[in-house]
Amino acid sequence: NLDPTNNPGVLRAESAETAWSRKGPAGKSCADCHAGGAARSMRGVAVRYPRHVAQYHRVMAIEDYLTIHGPETTGRPLPIEGAENLDLTMLVKMASDGVPVAVDTTSAPARAALARGKATFHKRVGERNHACADCHTPDKGANKFLGGRFLGDATAGFTRHFPTWRTSQNDAWDMRKRFQWCMTPLGTNMLSADSIEYAELELYLTQFDNGKPLNVPGIRH
């Protein structure tokens, strides 16, 4: 992000401060449990996600966790890909900007999830019989152009700027929406945004950003 002051996503994330402090039907807000504001209390949290959450028996990204944790604690629904979920996700992630990504890749649940995420990455699907790997690994389509679109290299890491502002869409997208958008040209049905398959795929991709600083929200075409 060459000029974060010229990123509409930053303004959108900052507006989430209101949601952070607003009490839900249960009479509590995020701020009631996380004192000091999001910038202080959430510092270093986002770089550990996606991760396996034992309480829920699955891998979760920040967006997944908010979907369940928000209603449980505040009584306020925060559905994944909803505006408030996305804004709060950006707010939480911005608190860790500059902190190196450090997702777990060594525990037994993480290793199992990474194996499943890798299988999804290499699985051929849809009318075109393509896999994610066909476009996003350096020995295949990565670092080339397809239909005017540059195909990024997953093994070089491209998750640490999500959610990102899409100038072509005039909107912020999280990683799940990017996954769903990618499935359209493959001629296959997209999964629901909160699917475990997407969460494990996101973990698999995020491991390639381990050690690199978080930079949210990104800005891309």
What does each model-identified segment do?
Residues 12-22, 114-123:
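Short, intrinsically disordered, charge-biased short linear motifs at domain edges
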Residues 1-9, 22-32, 40-86, 94-98, ...:
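Electron-transfer interface patches adjacent to heme c in soluble/periplasmic c-type cytochromes
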Residues 11, 109-112, 196:
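Alpha-helix N-cap/N′ positions at the starts of helices
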